[in-house]
Each structure stands twice: as structure tokens, then as C-alpha cells.
């Protein structure tokens, strides 16, 4: 631990930050354990104030030594517990801060020469993160290409919340993942191609809030959306950034909206790019209604000038309760006399 203190002092001197380590020890069998790691820097606006960049209760790491000689990294275990973080001014585009209960991963296949990463298993749990985007950063025209390819065999996220604040805090997106999982994900950072074989979400919650718009009394307020009890299953999810092409197969989707609308299930394939949306086998169910449809729509179908085409074939059975949610402005006698079936 004396040597660790010397290294921490040297790092503090070189970085201009206060870096300290409470204790270093060996974890069974031969893993390195670090406790009470702290990194503190002066505030970017108030030098007399200090910001905690990182405060880690415990870090455990096990890395194989021999592969390092051939520029490969084999991580048997990497585990962080009790993390408090704040990126302060390190990332100009955004400030990320929050807490992480547990972050762990194992990775056997990090190759610096080939620029590939294989993550065998990763877990993030009990995290609460806030992302504040900045509107004062000019675009970076000096970025160098990133050729890394990342393959994730299994990623689980439990009891985690993330809040994104748009510049000026005009818009806010709040997402909670009760239990989420990704299987067989491939991410090509150079070609901007992303693919996930399977995505599952249980007990999710999503809120979208436009703070500059007053709340509407409509069944669904597009400026203030709150979805709860979100359960989702997606197969064959892919996205190509260059063409804006999105493809997926919705296996199941259920949710509740704050205004009373409840979706019991949505399923079917979907494809979308910058010009067109296709849902050839859409099935939508609520507790009282169902809809089967085939949709082929140009995204400019409702444009005032030169509108595109819309093709829709549908069969449906609509229950009274669902219809009445969209007829709240109709006279009460009219709504009462509407037949139940």
C-alpha cells in the first residue's frame, strides 16, 4: 500500500487532480482488489470548489498477463461497486453524472492490432445516471476514424435509470429498465452498423417531457408522455446509420400510457429508412380491441406539397372503452348510448 500511495501521488501531480486509494489487496484466488478509490479536481468555474470525478467503493480486476505481450487483453473479471461519477468538463458535448451499484464484465478477445473487442458477459445494476447535453460545442471536424468492432455475447441491465436533458433543459427523456437483456450484439463503429439478435425488457418505464409546452387534456399528450409497465421483446434488430435503415421483428410489446390507453400486445416485422415505413404483418391488441394490418407508407405521405403514397389493408374489432377514450369531447348522452359491441 505504500507503493500504491506513491503511484497515487505521482498521478495526482501529473493530472492536477487529487487521486487517492484507501487500500489494495489480493482477492481470492489472485485478483487485485482496490478499495476507496477517489479522483477529485477543481471546479471548472469555481477553483475553490472541488468536484468528485470518481469515487469507487471497490474495484476488483483479473487480467491475464501473457496475452498483453501480443497486444491482446484477456479480462477474466472486472468489477466496480459503489461508483459515484461526474465527467465535469472532460466531455465537451455532455456532462454525465450519477451512481452505479455494480458494473461487471468478462472479456476474452480484446485485440489492439485488429481493433476488435469481444465481451463475454456484462452486467450493470442499480445505476442512476443523468446526461446533460450542451448546446455550446461547435462540431468537431478533426475527428479521426474509429475502426473498432465490438461483439457482445450477453449484456444484462437491472434496476437502472437514465435521464437525458436536452440543451437548455427544454426536453427531458427519462427511462427506467427494471430488467433488460441483450444477446449477440455486434457494433461496427467505422461503418456505423449495429445489430442485436435479441433484446428483452421487463418492468420498464419511459417518460418524455417538453417543459415549454402546457399539458393537454387529450387521451395522449405528445409533449408529455409517460409509459409504464413496458414489456418488450425484439428479434433481429439492426440499424445502418448511413442509410437510416432500421429493421426489427417485434415479438411482443405491452405497456400502459398515463392517459389510460393500454396496449396488451404488438407484434410483427418492421422496416424503416429515411423514405419509407413498412409493417406487412402488424398485430395490435388492447384488452378490448384488436387490429391486423399491412402498412406501406412513404414518410412524406401527409406532406402539403407532393405527398407520397400510403397503402393500408386492415381488419379490426374496436371495443367501446377504446373508442370512448378518443371521443371525450363528444356529448355525454352520445357516449352513453354507444353500443358496447
Model regions and ranges:
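Short, surface-exposed beta-strand-loop junctions and turns on beta-sheet-rich folds
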Residues: 40-41, 138, 170-171, 214-215, ...
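Short, surface-exposed beta-strand/loop "edge" segments at domain boundaries and coil↔beta transitions
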Residues: 163-165, 171, 202-210, 255-257, ...
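Short beta-strand segments that buttress and anchor functional surface loops
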Residues: 36-39, 251-255, 280-286
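Flexible beta-edge/linker motif
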Residues: 22-134, 145-167, 176, 181-209, ...
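Strand-loop-strand
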Residues: 274-292, 296-309, 324-341
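N-terminal type II signal-anchor transmembrane helix
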Residues: 1-16, 44-46
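Beta-propeller and related beta-repeat scaffolds in trafficking/envelope systems
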Residues: 51, 80, 93-98, 103, ...
Amino acid at each position: 500500500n505504500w507503493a500504491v500511495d506513491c503511484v497515487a501521488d505521482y498521478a495526482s501531480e501529473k493530472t492536477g487532480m487529487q487521486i487517492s486509494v484507501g487500500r489494495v489487496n489480493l482477492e481470492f484466488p489472485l485478483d487485485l482488489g482496490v478499495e476507496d478509490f477517489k479522483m477529485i479536481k477543481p471546479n471548472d468555474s469555481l477553483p475553490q470548489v472541488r468536484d468528485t470525478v470518481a469515487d469507487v467503493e471497490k474495484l476488483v480486476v483479473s487480467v491475464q498477463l501473457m496475452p498483453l505481450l501480443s497486444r491482446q487483453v484477456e479480462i477474466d473479471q472486472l468489477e466496480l461497486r459503489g461508483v459515484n461519477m461526474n465527467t465535469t468538463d472532460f466531455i465537451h458535448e455532455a456532462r454525465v453524472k450519477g451512481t452505479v451499484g455494480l458494473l461487471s464484465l468478462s472479456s476474452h478477445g480484446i485485440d489492439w492490432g485488429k481493433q476488435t473487442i469481444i465481451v463475454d458477459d456484462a452486467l450493470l445494476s442499480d445505476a442512476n445516471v443523468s446526461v446533460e447535453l450542451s448546446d455550446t460545442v461547435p462540431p468537431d471536424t478533426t475527428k479521426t476514424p474509429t475502426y473498432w468492432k465490438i461483439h457482445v455475447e450477453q449484456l444484462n441491465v437491472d434496476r437502472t435509470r437514465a435521464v437525458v436533458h436536452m440543451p437548455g433543459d427544454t426536453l427531458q427523456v427519462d427511462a427506467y429498465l427494471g430488467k433488460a437483456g441483450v444477446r449477440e450484439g455486434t457494433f461496427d463503429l467505422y461503418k456505423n452498423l449495429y445489430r442485436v439478435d435479441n433484446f428483452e425488457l421487463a418492468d420498464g418505464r419511459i417518460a418524455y417531457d417538453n417543459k415549454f409546452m402546457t399539458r393537454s387534456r387529450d387521451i395522449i399528450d405528445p409533449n408529455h408522455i409517460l409509459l409504464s409497465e413496458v414489456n418488450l421483446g425484439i428479434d433481429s434488430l439492426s440499424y445502418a446509420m448511413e442509410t437510416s435503415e432500421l429493421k426489427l421483428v417485434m415479438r411482443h410489446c405491452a405497456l400502459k400510457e398515463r392517459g389510460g390507453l393500454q396496449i396488451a400486445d404488438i407484434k410483427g416485422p418492421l422496416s424503416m429508412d429515411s423514405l419509407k415505413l413498412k409493417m406487412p404483418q402488424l398485430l395490435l391488441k388492447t384488452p378490448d380491441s384488436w387490429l391486423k394490418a399491412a402498412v406501406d407508407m412513404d414518410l412524406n405521405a401527409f406532406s402539403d406539397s407532393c405527398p407520397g403514397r400510403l397503402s393500408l389493408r386492415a381488419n379490426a374489432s374496436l371495443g367501446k372503452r377504446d373508442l370512448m377514450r378518443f371521443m371525450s369531447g363528444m356529448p355525454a348522452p352520445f357516449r352513453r348510448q354507444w353500443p358496447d359491441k
